[in-house]
Amino acid sequence: MQLYNTMTRTKEPFVSRVPGKVAMYVCGITAYDLCHIGHARSSVVFDVLVRYLRHIGFDVTFVRNFTDVDDKIIKKANAEGTTSQEIAERYIATFYEDMDKLGILRPNAEPKATEYIGEMASLAQRLIDSGHAYRTPSGDVYFRVRSFAGYGKLSGRDVEDMRSGARVAPGEEKEDPLDFALWKASKPGEPVWESPFGPGRPGWHLECSAMSEKLLGMPIDIHGGGQDLIFPHHENEIAQSEAAIGGEFCRYWVHNGFVRINTEKMSKSLGNFITIRDIYARYLPEVLRFFLLSSQYRSPLDYSDQGLDEAEKGIKRIYAAKVQMEQALGRAKWSETKLPADVTEELSRHEEGFTAAMDDDLNTAQAMGHVFGLVRLAGRLMEDKTLAKSRETAEVLGRILADFGVWAEVLGVFGTDATAFLADLKACRLTRLGIDAARVDGLVAERQDARKAKDFARSDAIRDELASLGVTVMDTPTGPQWDIA
């Protein structure tokens, strides 16, 4: 498997530090508000990475943190007249609700920053002792950026360029404008902990370094997050961790691309974000997950209702194909008709193609293409009146269903009961489009009566009325069935 390493700006063969084992850390949410679709993308990307690494045989220890002490949390708590802890607990709970519906597997460990204050203070003290950090008279602790020769290597930024125009804000006691906070001295209205440098709270960057070292050891194999974290957060993590341990902090840096709305990065700070719950109000969670897997994870993803509609159609095709294959395999008797040689070749090509796509920097978009390739292959076999009866067709369909079962575990989609999913999808679409199912059932029954009475003018009029609602009717041997176009 190859992964794109942000540090080297190239795809590299993935080789773990300890053979067969992977230590992986991903920056989690700052728990002060509902999660948006950008959080959903990052969660899905790294969930699939963990799933695939396990699929190909790695024992993955996955850690994802919660930032439960931060300026934004404190600001919200003060505005609501409550505590930072209450705010953090509230939004950690909503995070779990959203992510469980999205099919995100729970990590091996989910540390909260406030649970590791001692480790953070210890790390800051080590940096002070080694000359990489300093305590100010007011009790703040800053990291000396210029003391770390590799600063900027992840983001590709030059220290001198960053220094140009930078200023120390009034009231700050930094030696250099580039220095960043490891520990913030206590202030009224903020949570506080004791430390060797006096009462205060940790800086944001310190927590991930301390928790990853404590829970995973150094160096970790994979550190993940959104591209917005490359600078300053991950750059600062590298500086403080490598300055403290005197060696490599992380071997592979993996970052997912932004979600964009109207070509702009979506974020809370820009005020153009769409919460996950906004989407769940109109689409099934699995449709959102499918949509997020429709592009390569490093590429920008443009959000739109049209994109979700296309994802809905796509996942419906897969589930419908599963139902058709399961029904086809219920045949009591099979012929010995031989399949063309290219059928098994096509099947193998898509199976190998799926693996090759996932091995190529987790290219889920290309992998999905091979899923649909097997949907088309199954459709051709079932539609051919002669081949549909062949025992060899049954073997191919069984193999495709088995492939889908394995791939569903890897991707986290199309793995539930197909009939139940299609019923839920239909109900969701009816609600979103404002279509009354009872009215449709009545019109379909009325059309059926008209057909029996050979009143084809009335039957056609009802069909047109249904079409105006976006409903199509299929006449089957067991009676009419309808769906939303």
From Swiss-Prot:
Descriptive protein name = Cysteine--tRNA ligase
| Keyword Membrane included in the entry's annotation | no
Q: What is the lineage of its organism?
A: Bacteria, Pseudomonadati, Thermodesulfobacteriota, Desulfovibrionia, Desulfovibrionales
Q: Which SUPFAM superfamilies match?
A: Anticodon-binding domain of a subclass of class I aminoacyl-tRNA synthetases (SSF47323), Nucleotidylyl transferase (SSF52374)
Cellular component GO terms, alphabetical: cytosol
Q: Name one Pfam family in it.
A: CysS_C
Q: Name one GO biological process term.
A: cysteinyl-tRNA aminoacylation
Q: Which catalysed reactions does the entry list for this protein?
A: tRNA(Cys) + L-cysteine + ATP = L-cysteinyl-tRNA(Cys) + AMP + diphosphate
- Binding site residues for ATP: K268
Family stated for the protein in its record? Belongs to the class-I aminoacyl-tRNA synthetase family.
